[in-house]
Design a protein with these regions (language model features):
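Hydrophobic alpha-helical segments within soluble ligand-binding/sensing domains
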Residues: 148-183, 221-225, 284-303
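Periplasmic-binding protein-like
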Residues: 92, 116-124, 181-187, 231-243, ...
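N-terminal helix-turn-helix DNA-binding module of bacterial transcription factors
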Residues: 1-59
Length: 321
């Protein structure tokens, strides 16, 4: 018995998006070239779409959710909050991971915007804040970045990072730690504004200490960390707790003791950050509430932007022990 063809199969065979295939079956706009291709494969395979696929366009309780990575820890918290709010309001959510692809983000926004939906939530990438494509689009909420022309739920990064950097450096100075330099390690695919912000804050707070940046092409790949040579008496600020945790392994490989030879600080406060040895100093943001509020704002048609909250988590990795 042959397996029934799906929209995903059609999308894969033709090299077009699943949303394009969905628009074809729901009477939406599809280019003539793609329409001819889909016509041919539908007739050849006697394909008929299932009821769920055909009903998507007719539903008005759908919310699109777009993120660079659905599986990241912080994104998962935003999703949990969004789903909780959606369930309370009998709304349904459709998710799309862009893989940090600029074109994938644009295409997903266009396709969600074409549905009869409540709106779209976008976890901002560095493309989101530069892209004129978004000008004029309605019912879009950005999370993680402040963009004047749209509704945004943004984190108080300047206040949080200033507090984190200043507290860490002042504490080490009070403990008479032999701190000689500062380094910031980040993922090149992430928002560049955080990199610029932390570099400025470090220069203001510790102007006499040398500081440097190091970019990782992909912070999820273990091999990318092999280029990092940790130096004694350096403090390493990391763009995420995940990067910081990878540096723990590098420190062990290089026989450096965290809290004595070097100091490591993260951003994000993952579930297991306080379970590390030594426990990781970091800063926590209210990701769950951001997701929850984003859905509620779409439902209420509230386009006002708002700032989130943060909490410092000062632990052992930033102390001279």
């Amino acid at each position: 018995m042959t397996q029934k063809m799906t929209m995903a199969d059609i999308s894969k065979q033709l090299g077009i998006s699943k949303m394009t295939v969905s628009r074809y079956f729901n009477g939406g706009y599809v280019s003539e070239e793609n329409r001819i291709k889909i016509d041919a494969i539908v007739k050849e395979n006697h394909y008929t779409p299932n009821k769920f696929a055909r009903s998507i366009r007719s539903q008005s309780n759908i919310i699109g959710f777009i993120a660079p990575r659905i599986e990241s820890y912080t994104t998962s918290l935003v999703i949990k909050g969004a789903l909780a709010a959606a369930n309370e309001s009998n709304a349904r959510m459709l998710f799309h991971a862009t893989g940090f692809s600029h074109e994938s983000e644009r295409q997903a926004v266009s396709e969600f915007n074409g549905l009869n939906a409540l709106g779209t939530i976008v976890i901002a990438s560095k493309h989101s804040i530069e892209e004129p494509f978004y000008n004029g689009l309605q019912n879009i909420i950005f999370i993680g970045k402040q963009i004047p022309t749209h509704c945004c739920l943004y984190y108080p990064e300047q206040a949080a990072i200033t507090a984190l950097v200043s507290h860490t450096i002042y504490q080490l100075q009070q403990q008479q730690a032999p701190l000689t330099a500062i380094q910031y390690i980040y993922d090149a695919r992430m928002l560049s504004s955080r990199t610029q912000l932390i570099q400025s804050i470090i220069s203001d707070i510790a102007p006499t200490l040398p500081n440097a940046l190091q970019a990782l092409a992909d912070s999820e790949k273990k091999d990318d960390y092999q280029s990092i040579i940790l130096q004694p008496n350096h403090i390493y600020f990391c763009a995420t707790d995940n990067i910081a945790i990878r540096l723990y392994r590098r420190a062990k490989e290089q026989h450096l003791k965290i809290g004595h030879d070097i100091w490591i600080v993260g951003i994000g406060d993952y579930d297991y950050s306080d379970l590390l040895v030594p426990s990781l100093t970091t800063v926590a943001f209210n990701h769950y509430q951001m997701g929850y509020q984003a859905v509620k704002k779409l439902i209420k048609r509230d386009s006002s932007s708002c700032e989130g909250e943060f909490e410092l988590k000062i632990r052992e990795s930033s102390q001279f022990i």
